Amino acid sequence: MSDTHLEIERTYDLPEGGALPDLVGVGGILRTEHQDPFELDATYWDTDRYDLVAARVTVRRRTGGPDAGWHIKRSESDTVRHEQHFPLTDDAETVPTEVLAALFTERRGRGLHPVVRITTTRTVTRLLDEDGDQVAELADDLVHAQRLDDDAPETPRTWREVEVETVDGVDAQVAHELFAALDGRFADVGAGPAAVASKLARGLAGAPAPRLQTAEKPDKGTTARVLVKRLRKLRTALLTQEARLRSGDTTDLRQAADTALEIAAIMGGYRPAFAAGDALDRAAEAADGLAEVTARAALAEYLVDRLPRASSPAQDELVDAMTRERILAATRERRDQSVRDVVVFLHGEPFLELLDALDDAVERPAPTAWALRSPKKVAQDVGAEVKPHVRELVRAAVADDTSDTAAEREAADRATTEAAWQATMRARLTMDVLGDDAFPHALWKRIGTAADVLTERVRALHALDALRTTAAIAERGGEGTFGYGVLAGDRVRLAEESYDEAVHALNRV
């Protein structure tokens, strides 16, 4: 079991032997209560590459004080952290399984080992209001940090710092107003906000940390500069979305599908921008796999929202409650299975390889000569690849099918339409990265229109397939199927309309 809370604090640098400022009268603080000093002993862990530090995450095993145990801290800013506590274990040499599981993505699936031992002599002062209720806690820390790597200096680093942490439940804005008021009092005694707010970061100073080694940004005006900037945003979005999906929150499902597809589009459409190698090839395949599995889940989520109801009120009144409930149950089951498939993918080695590739592309870009050209020149090459590929799939999607049975024709129609849809969606996202300033505006617009109408057609075809399956189950159970027919007719109309629009749009690509 673990518990999580929000930690809002500010750290100040104070000279050793210097006096603490008088804080009475600041932000509702009317009296203070000093406590006896106590000792803290913490060992911090990370991967060989220091992936956790790079992700602004710390994990430690700490003894002493009121909250001994294993702690995970995720920094939102220099003052705001999300802290997760796990019970203290007797085995100080092994990270508990539940801690490793909580850090799976940040550690990129790699093992952890001790990197720093930090011992602290802490003296706490409770900061109280007029009623004696605690406003914040001041911790005056004398810190000793010893790196544990092979190149560590023999002498520990020593410094003094003061942490002021607000009590649980205080609004972040109120907390920062308090800190702003405290800054003046600390300045009066020659202290100020710490240049480095993390004990771990200070303790690791000089450590050989591969993930902390970065390269210069590509020059402005180059395609490489645009790609690095875009991939940085996509990586941030992906990590946020995958964390929510792991926790069972599906609210970002469609956004996750869009993010995954754009990453796949960049790694595929701009492949010459990245150095050749098996690792990047595997990462590109992983991006394709993630895009595919999240697209299925997003489509399943769409069916949950839209399939139980017709597009017009008049038609909707013809659908009985039992039909609606069965459809809703079936679509939710399909959605839940699709989400499980996504979570399984997020726990796999290909996803970790994709994250490693994104880390390198963003933190240590090594652009090729092709990528160092202007966006307009690169767009010419990309357009020459994208346009014929889309056209080929378009012809297959709008061609007459000669399959013997209706079921075979429908399956073939769905497959070719999906292929054209995926190609046009990728093409649009590929072009969106550089924009219509680089690509011909007419082509950019036509690809976008084709992607929109194909999205509607794919949704309609999948809706028909789901309705057919659910109606067959209902019929075998002796239930009426009139409502399914109403909804199916509605979807057939949408499919036919979107088909005509798709043919018109795609023939212009």
Regions found by a protein language model. Name each.
Residues 1-509:
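Function-determining surface determinants
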